[in-house]
Regions:
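Intrinsic low-complexity, intrinsically disordered segments enriched in polar/basic residues
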Residues: 1-4, 204-206
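Cysteine-nucleophile protease catalytic domains, especially the papain-like/related folds used
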Residues: 2-91, 197, 231-233
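Short amphipathic alpha-helical surface micro-motifs
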Residues: 6, 91-94, 216-220
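Conserved active-site-adjacent core of cysteine acyl-enzyme catalytic domains
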Residues: 9, 51-189
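Generic signature of intrinsically disordered, low-complexity segments enriched in small/polar residues
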Residues: 29, 33, 37-39, 60, ...
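Low-complexity, Gly/Ser/Thr/Pro-rich intrinsically disordered linker/tail segments
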Residues: 167-251
Length: 251
């Protein structure tokens, strides 16, 4: 599933379905093309010779399998370095006023939040996910948010609360299975990932009562992450005017 969004310059940009650990890279890929006409796909779809954000982030030690667990100033600087002549990115405190100011100025916000099963923000502290905020709606305090290849309308106060609720995560294990084997696996690079209970127990973390044909040697460990420090209370803002708001508080 995906949607096509026309930017102010008249370019059509596809926002692809982004689920599982690569959701942040899909969000970033959309932002770079929408604002700066920089076309770097989130993943290479199995072509190891093709440039992708996932390949670059892995090479530079910023991700294990494609997860983006960082909205700090160091990540903002890393993203800017992808193309310093074009990209304006800053880590700022996630609050309604900053979101509205950025969107009204023609920028975009990448906001981490806790997503529920329907795609809306919740306050569980778990299931950290990324959305891209596009523009403020006429209804006060709401904005268009893109994720999962769809556009949604989010209440910004609820989104801010959801962002601040993000909790730390324990060590995770992800293994590869043949593509399209199961509908609940996460497609990455031509194979599918499922979260395993441990690095040796290939039972699905979500308690599905099925054995998994895990590819030998494919299980990757994502270390425990202090998301309450690297994601909660923060967001990444992108502007197309080549300047950052001097009043914004860097995170």
């Amino acid at each position: 599933m995906s949607i096509t969004i026309t930017n102010p310059e008249g370019r059509n940009v596809e926002f692809k379905d982004q689920r599982g650990p690569t959701c942040g890279l899909y969000a970033l890929s959309f932002v770079l093309e929408y604002l700066y006409d920089i076309k770097i796909p989130a993943t290479a779809d199995g072509d190891k010779t093709r440039e992708s954000l996932r390949n670059r982030f892995k090479k530079d030690g910023k991700t294990v399998i494609g997860e983006l667990y960082d909205a700090t100033s160091s990540m903002a600087d890393y993203i800017k370095a992808l193309d310093p002549s074009k990209i304006t990115c800053q880590s700022v405190a996630c609050d309604v006023a900053a979101i509205i100011e950025t969107l009204n100025g023609g920028g975009l916000c990448m906001v981490p939040f806790c997503v529920d099963a329907s795609g809306k923000p919740d306050h569980s502290g778990i299931h950290a996910h990324w959305c891209v905020l596009l523009n403020v709606r006429e209804v006060a305090g709401t904005a268009v948010a893109c994720h999962w290849g769809q556009d949604h309308v989010f209440n910004l106060s609820q989104l801010e609360e959801s962002n601040k609720a993000i909790k730390d995560v324990e060590e995770q294990y992800w293994g590869k299975i043949p593509a399209a084997s199961y509908s609940f696996s996460i497609p990455i690079e031509g194979l599918n990932y499922v979260q395993c209970k441990t690095n040796t127990d290939t039972s699905c973390k979500c308690e599905y009562p099925l054995p998994f044909p895990i590819k030998s040697g494919s299980i990757k460990s994502i270390p425990a992450k202090p998301l309450s420090q690297t994601l909660a209370g923060k967001m990444l803002v992108f502007r197309n005017n080549g300047s950052c708001d001097e009043n914004a508080v860097s995170q």
